[in-house]
Curated annotation (Swiss-Prot):
Name recorded for this polypeptide: Cyclic pyranopterin monophosphate synthase
Gene from which this protein is expressed: moaC
Cited CDD domains: MoaC_PE
Entry coiled-coil feature ranges: none
Species, as recorded: Clostridium botulinum (strain Alaska E43 / Type E3)
Catalytic activity, reaction form: (8S)-3',8-cyclo-7,8-dihydroguanosine 5'-triphosphate = cyclic pyranopterin phosphate + diphosphate
Length: 159
């Protein structure tokens, strides 16, 4: 089977893929990424003492909002009726990192990979925004799709 980009027509014009004839199935996507911070920033996040408030709480809400708005940010992405979106954090004190994981679900005829990736990206950017007064050298890294299930192309695992 030949691999080809499906967001282009035969003349190379950008198109929105027609998903109208695809079966509605439950689809799940999980994405993750990390932000590396300095020790003071890590402690402020961990202890909830950042000047702007609850960094992880605000970042979680931002990530969920971003998942819901993905089709407004990515030009050829379909608007979806997301059935669930979760954002989880793992604090990694040895490496001074916060790992963010998003899980997005939909019952529909197209997947939610872009929503999961957008949720992680926005969550990480919100952490950066809320902490930049004390740490401008933070590094966002390793944003990737970890898993997707459902749909014609089958399951994908990258963990």
């Amino acid at each position: 089977m030949e691999n080809k980009f499906n967001h282009f027509d035969n003349e190379g014009n950008a198109i929105m893929v027609d998903v109208g004839n695809k079966n509605a199935t439950e689809r799940i996507a999980i994405a993750s990424g990390k932000i590396r911070v300095n020790r003071d920033t890590f402690l402020a996040i961990e202890q909830g003492t950042a000047k702007k408030g609850d960094v992880l709480g605000v970042a979680r809400v931002a990530g969920i909002m971003a998942a819901k708005k993905t089709s407004e940010l990515i030009p050829l992405c379909h608007p979806l009726m997301i059935t669930n979106c979760t954002i989880d954090f793992e604090l990694l004190p040895k490496t001074l990192e916060v790992e963010v994981t998003s899980k997005v679900k939909v019952t529909g005829n197209t997947g939610v990979e872009m929503e999961a990736l957008t949720a992680v990206s926005t969550t990480l950017l919100t952490i950066y925004d809320m902490c930049k007064a004390i740490d401008k050298a933070m590094e966002i890294d390793n944003i990737h799709l970890r898993r997707k299930t459902g749909g014609k192309s089958g399951d994908f695992i990258n963990e």
